[in-house]
Amino acid sequence: MPRVKRGVQARARHKKVLKQAKGYYGARSRVYRVAFQAVTKAGQYAYRDRRAKKRQFRQLWIARINAASRQNGLSYSRFINGLKKASIEIDRKILADIAVFDKAAFAVLVEKAKAAL
C-alpha cells in the first residue's frame, strides 16, 4: 500500500479558514489555530443572531405601532384587537411602515379599529 502524504489537503483546509478570517485582528487572521477558533465562534454568533434578528425587528415594529397608535388615542393592544375585530389583516411590518411613512392612512386604520371595539 503506498504512503499517503496529506499536505495538500491540510494546506487547502488552512487556506480556506485563513481566507474566512481575513480582516480579523492580529493572530486571529494569521495563525491557523487561533483563526479556526475565531471563525468557528463567528459562525455560532451568526447562526444565533440570524434568529435574534427576527425577534428584534418584531420588537421594533411593535414599538413603532404602539407610539403611532398612542398618538391617535389608542394603546397598541387595543389597536391590534380592534383590527382583528374589524377583520383587517395587515402584518406588523406593514403597519409599522404605514405608521412611519403615511400617518393619514394610519389614522384611518386607528379609527376603524376604534369603531370595531
From Swiss-Prot:
Entry keywords, A to Z: Ribonucleoprotein, Ribosomal protein, RNA-binding, rRNA-binding
InterPro entries xref list: Ribosomal_bL20, RIBOSOMAL_L20_CS, Ribosomal_protein_bL20_C
One GO molecular-function entry: rRNA binding
Entry GO CC: ribonucleoprotein complex; ribosome
Signal peptide, first to last residue: none
Family annotation (Pfam families): Ribosomal_L20
CDD domains hit by this protein: Ribosomal_L20
Biological-process GO terms, alphabetical: ribosomal large subunit assembly; translation
Function: Binds directly to 23S ribosomal RNA and is necessary for the in vitro assembly process of the 50S ribosomal subunit. It is not involved in the protein synthesizing functions of that subunit.
HAMAP family linked: Ribosomal_bL20
NCBIfam families found in the cross-reference section: rplT_bact (TIGR01032)
Name of the molecule in the record: Large ribosomal subunit protein bL20
Species of origin: Vibrio campbellii (strain ATCC BAA-1116)
Phylogenetic placement of the source organism: Bacteria, Pseudomonadati, Pseudomonadota, Gammaproteobacteria, Vibrionales
Gene that specifies this protein: rplT
